């Protein structure tokens, strides 16, 4: 795989055919303009003035919160607890094998970038993995040479699997020094982690929250509690990093749809209605190939930026997956990692193998590159359906101010 098909190359070709309406990595137009909000939706419950100004000025001690209902948290727990463990052989046969690897590569590049930043001031790195799942990022932290990792998730089965993965990794490491680890089952949208740490005074250099934070936007209280858990124990100069669906992109695609749903054969997003998008509790159902629907909530990113100021957090960047990919793929080390992780599919398919998508139109962008005759084969790409699915996400990074 000597040439990596850049999404921008794909977009430019797709746009030339479709008039630029639906490129796989198209930017949201008018990104700084908010989705349509009713007057009542521009305020949070109990506020008579701008909620964002009020939140930024709130004291460090949180206000007394009303008792929250169970909400959708139990659905999320059930969903992730019931996901079966599958081996590499089974995963490699999946329609979204390369898509999953691509998203995993994005996390690797993001985590690696900020571990390097922290290493410039300390080698004794402590990390909070907020929404650790089954431990998919353990090897990334091992590669980063961190000293301590706290893993927490709402799903108890996932936390147990994460802990077992850690024990297996440590057992196989022989003489290699492996970071210490702590495992907590907790709903980080409703419970304070600071009351559960083994070391009550622990401080973190990095909090990583991958494909999880959007679950907290069910209510302001939940989003604020999760943000507090992510940020309140960060050292000055520490980072809160993560990946989350891009609310602007989701709304743009919904508004362009004739129904309350959009997607393709890989993913589907379904909203209850269109036209009004409250700041919190804007629920939609997201389904990915081979994965049952699970409710998620729209994240209006400017609100997150304002809320983070309460915890002395400053946004240092927000990038779409397209932007981040274009930046990182220029790095030879990241490009090699992309290949090792099988994050892109080889095109044309190798002898005696098939492309993951049977639809010819899914590879029109790659075929055009081949027809140009100016690249060395095979090239690395994703099917158009997979590019469309992964392009709903963005990456973010906040820094704790002194």
From Swiss-Prot:
Q: Which gene encodes it?
A: rnmt
Which GO MF terms does the UniProt record name? Answer: mRNA 5'-cap (guanine-N7-)-methyltransferase activity; RNA binding
In this chain, the stretch annotated as Disordered covers 1-75
Q: Which UniProt keywords apply?
A: Methyltransferase, mRNA capping, mRNA processing, Nucleus, RNA-binding, S-adenosyl-L-methionine, Transferase
Basic and acidic residues: compositionally biased ranges: 1-11, 55-72
Family the UniProt entry places it in? Belongs to the class I-like SAM-binding methyltransferase superfamily. mRNA cap 0 methyltransferase family.
Q: What InterPro entries does this protein map onto?
A: mRNA_G-N7_MeTrfase_dom (IPR004971), mRNA_G-N7_MeTrfase_euk (IPR016899), RG7MT1 (IPR039753), SAM-dependent_MTases_sf (IPR029063)
The record's Gene Ontology biological-process terms are: 7-methylguanosine mRNA capping
Which residues does the annotation say bind S-adenosyl-L-methionine?
A: 107, 131, 153, 187, 210, 215
Please state what the protein is called.
Answer: mRNA cap guanine-N(7) methyltransferase
The protein's role, per its UniProt record? Catalytic subunit of the mRNA-capping methyltransferase RNMT:RAMAC complex that methylates the N7 position of the added guanosine to the 5'-cap structure of mRNAs. Binds RNA containing 5'-terminal GpppC.
Coarse class of the primary localization is nucleus
- What organism is listed for this UniProt entry? Xenopus laevis
Q: Where is the mRNA cap 0 methyltransferase domain?
A: 94-401
EC no. given is 2.1.1.56
Q: Which residues bind mRNA?
A: 103-104
Site mRNA cap binding: give positions: 134, 140, 165, 214, 296, 393
Q: What class of enzyme is it?
A: transferase
Gene Ontology, cellular component aspect: mRNA cap methyltransferase RNMT:RAMAC complex; nucleus
Q: Where in the cell is it found?
A: Nucleus
Q: Where is the composition biased (Polar residues)?
A: 35-50
Q: Which catalytic reaction applies to this protein?
A: a 5'-end (5'-triphosphoguanosine)-ribonucleoside in mRNA + S-adenosyl-L-methionine = a 5'-end (N(7)-methyl 5'-triphosphoguanosine)-ribonucleoside in mRNA + S-adenosyl-L-homocysteine
Source domain of life is: Eukaryota
